[in-house]
Amino acid sequence: MSRDRFRSRGGGGGGFHRRGGGGGRGGLHDFRSPPPGMGLNQNRGPMGPGPGGPKPPLPPPPPHQQQQQPPPQQPPPQQPPPHQQPPPHQPPHQQPPPPPQESKPVVPQGPGSAPGVSSAPPPAVSAPPANPPTTGAPPGPGPTPTPPPAVPSTAPGPPPPSTPSSGVSTTPPQTGGPPPPPAGGAGPGPKPGPGPGGPKGGKMPGGPKPGGGPGMGAPGGHPKPPHRGGGEPRGGRQHHAPYHQQHHQGPPPGGPGPRTEEKISDSEGFKANLSLLRRPGEKTYTQRCRLFVGNLPADITEDEFKRLFAKYGEPGEVFINKGKGFGFIKLESRALAEIAKAELDDTPMRGRQLRVRFATHAAALSVRNLSPYVSNELLEEAFSQFGPIERAVVIVDDRGRSTGKGIVEFASKPAARKAFERCSEGVFLLTTTPRPVIVEPLEQLDDEDGLPEKLAQKNPMYQKERETPPRFAQHGTFEYEYSQRWKSLDEMEKQQREQVEKNMKDAKDKLESEMEDAYHEHQANLLRQDLMRRQEELRRMEELHSQEMQKRKEMQLRQEEERRRREEEMMIRQREMEEQMRRQREESYSRMGYMDPRERDMRMGGGGTMNMGDPYGSGGQKFPPLGGGGGIGYEANPGVPPATMSGSMMGSDMRTERFGQGGAGPVGGQGPRGMGPGTPAGYGRGREEYEGPNKKPRF
């Protein structure tokens, strides 16, 4: 470590030479460059005392002399230090220091001064390890005054005010007896100083710069430069010593001052830290944090009462009864209340001894007959319906098993009263098992403070009972006989209690077994009821289904009926239409009877052909037609016998066949025109120029 630090900071002793110029001229500059010089001295400081402990104390008194004695005096003594270096105290750290010495011969001068005192270093090394690092720098200048160092070492402490700055605690021991050895150690300190003094040296270099670190005070009366002096040339040390003294003198007063002020402020403004004294999840300002303060002076004010507890945090509610001399105060946490109780109990106040106790919890309830599966959280959740709860605890035995009892503390009395009344009148169950909880007011006992002798009532009965000290009764005496009777009575009570407890336990077991059987039966009944209910629901569903099916069937029937009715209506319409058409046809046929004979003959077909164009039809007949019908037929002439009609028809047919209508036309035409017995003029179809009245077609 020392070698690495030395290389990184100064690159060897050359760094010191460059800054210090080899002599005293660079001393101040060396001090300005703490990293190289101080690093070496710090690491070597402790080692210096081991091998060359006698040198350190000398530097403080000769700071002025050191300035006068630059490098020339130290070179010769450098050789002796090597002999002192061999001591076993500095084996590890001594090795790194030699390279700096080689680089700069002036550095070993410190040991030169120490050779004379080298005999002292071993003893002194053990006692003042702290001094060597600090004084390691001064020893360089000290070599000239080596003989007087013991005395001057103490003297330099007072003259240089550096001692206070360096550190109040460290200075006195160093100045006492060990200062001379550190001086010797300071001589070798340049090389070995970094070893033992490294830790302090590191602190001290930082200390001098800021202005009075504790590490710098370690040297005591000696100047701070010794740290750096261990590795730096003597001349530089001489200049540094005074500079360090001046630098330390300024800061020392400031350093101790703030510390004392801080202590005073801490003692005055001390207040307990709630975050450290409160458990996780603990509620603040509860009834458990409420203190009873008795024996208060009659003239105490509320402000005084609050100031009494000011250091224990901000108080909650405060109540004082001046007439009876007591009061109540609520603090933030139970821990703060316990601290306040322990500190203020029996505290004198205006000639009275204060009595501080925890106030009884007026809103606390005791809960019994709890199931072993009830926890604190379940208990709090169950009773939180009655009001805000401060604490809910299930009491357990030494193995952590539930005792069936618990405590519930409410934040207010109305909530506790409501819970007590509701649970007493009704049945409050916490678990599946029908096991109701039993709630009672909590019986609060003081098992912490008890009854001290000072609070006992010194009445005549007390004096009488306390006349005889504690003792064991002698056999056969009056005391022994009646004491035995008391013991037998207590034994009988114990037996009866055990018997009652046994009977109660048997009764509880029996009740639990009955409850178990009844519970199973109850479950079976519930299952049966559930089954019946499901069956009923199924039956109802079937009925609903059947009703639905019936409705569907009815709807289908209605639809079918409507369809048939529509079909029938359609058939009826068709029939009506057909009937109407038939009637129309019949009407048309009936009207044909009133038609012109020619039309009827034309419609009749064959009957009309016989008379049409038959010139002989009328002439062949024996009797002319009565009504003048156009044709010869039985329909028009019912009076004509059928034989005649047939004969005439036959004759006409024959004529028609023999003489076509075309050829007989003129003959038949001439005959009837001039002949009376012929067919009337208006009926013969052979007369083409005639047009009958019904010439217009009907269809």
UniProtKB/Swiss-Prot annotation:
Residues with Asymmetric dimethylarginine modification: R9
Modified-residue entries (N6,N6-dimethyllysine), positions: K306
Post-translational modification (record): Phosphorylated on multiple serine and threonine residues during apoptosis. Phosphorylation of C-terminal tyrosines promotes its cytoplasmic localization, impaired its binding to polypyrimidine RNA and led to cell cycle arrest. In resting T-cells is phosphorylated at Thr-679 by GSK3B which is proposed to promote association with THRAP and to prevent binding to PTPRC/CD45 pre-mRNA; T-cell activation leads to reduced phosphorylation at Thr-679.
Composition skew (Pro residues), residue ranges: 48-102, 120-163, 175-197
Principal location: nucleus
Sequence repeats: 9-11, 19-21, 25-27
Positions carrying Dimethylated arginine: R563, R685
Residues recorded as bearing Phosphothreonine in the entry: T360, T679
PROSITE patterns: RRM
Keyword Transcription appears in the UniProt entry: yes
N6-acetyllysine: modified positions: K200, K311, K330, K413, K464
Stretches assigned to coiled coil: 489-588
Record field: compositional bias (Low complexity): 105-119, 164-174
Cross-link (Glycyl lysine isopeptide (Lys-Gly) (interchain with G-Cter in SUMO2)) at residue(s): K263, K271, K330
Keywords: Acetylation, Activator, Biological rhythms, Coiled coil, Cytoplasm, DNA damage, DNA repair, DNA-binding, Immunity, Innate immunity, Isopeptide bond, Methylation, mRNA processing, mRNA splicing, Nucleus, Phosphoprotein, Repeat, Repressor, RNA-binding, Transcription, Transcription regulation, Ubl conjugation
Residue positions, PTM Phosphoserine: S8, S33, S265, S275, S366, S371, S488, S618
PTM annotation (Phosphotyrosine): residues: Y285, Y683
Sequence ranges of Basic and acidic residues compositional bias: 571-589, 685-699
UniProt feature, compositional bias: Gly residues: 9-26, 198-220, 604-633, 660-684
Any GO MF annotation of the entry: RNA binding
Entry's localization field: Nucleus speckle; Nucleus matrix; Cytoplasm
Domains: entry comment: The coiled coil domain mediates interaction with NONO, and can also mediate formation of long, linear homooligomers (in vitro). The coiled coil domain is required for optimal DNA binding, and optimal transcription activation.
Subunit description: Heterodimer with NONO. Monomer and component of the SFPQ-NONO complex, which is probably a heterotetramer of two 52 kDa (NONO) and two 100 kDa (SFPQ) subunits. The coiled coil domain mediates interaction with NONO, and can also mediate formation of long, linear homooligomers (in vitro). SFPQ is a component of spliceosome and U5.4/6 snRNP complexes. Interacts with SNRPA/U1A. Component of a snRNP-free complex with SNRPA/U1A. Part of complex consisting of SFPQ, NONO and MATR3. Interacts with polypyrimidine tract-binding protein 1/PTB. Part of a complex consisting of SFPQ, NONO and NR5A1.
Reported function: DNA- and RNA binding protein, involved in several nuclear processes. Essential pre-mRNA splicing factor required early in spliceosome formation and for splicing catalytic step II, probably as a heteromer with NONO. Binds to pre-mRNA in spliceosome C complex, and specifically binds to intronic polypyrimidine tracts. Involved in regulation of signal-induced alternative splicing.
Designated name of the protein: Splicing factor, proline- and glutamine-rich
UniProt organism field: Mus musculus (Mouse)
